[in-house]
Amino acid sequence: MPGVKVKEAEPFELALKKFKKQCEKAGILSEVRKREHYEKPSIKKKKKAIAARKRAMKKQRKMMD
């Protein structure tokens, strides 16, 4: 769980920025978006296969250069 200790002279905006950065690193926002709506297992499997194909194509293009 991200947490930020705010110093006396530190502006709120800076503390908020630090908190947002920690949340992003922890993957909280992506997890919330992923859990927002139910996704059928078959669709999850399809997305995973598509992502694997994209990674393979990208790796292959990188090897060609």
From Swiss-Prot:
Species in which this protein is naturally found: Geobacter metallireducens (strain ATCC 53774 / DSM 7210 / GS-15)
Family annotation (Pfam families): Ribosomal_S21 (PF01165)
Name of the protein this chain belongs to: Small ribosomal subunit protein bS21
Keywords: Ribonucleoprotein, Ribosomal protein
One Gene Ontology cellular component annotation held by this UniProt entry: ribonucleoprotein complex
Ribosomal protein keyword on record: yes
This protein's record includes keyword Ribonucleoprotein: yes
One GO-annotated biological process of the protein: translation
Family, similarity comment: Belongs to the bacterial ribosomal protein bS21 family.
GO terms assigned for molecular function: structural constituent of ribosome
Classification via Gene3D superfamilies: Ribosomal protein S8 (1.20.5.1150)
Family matches, as InterPro entries: Ribosomal_bS21, Ribosomal_bS21_sf
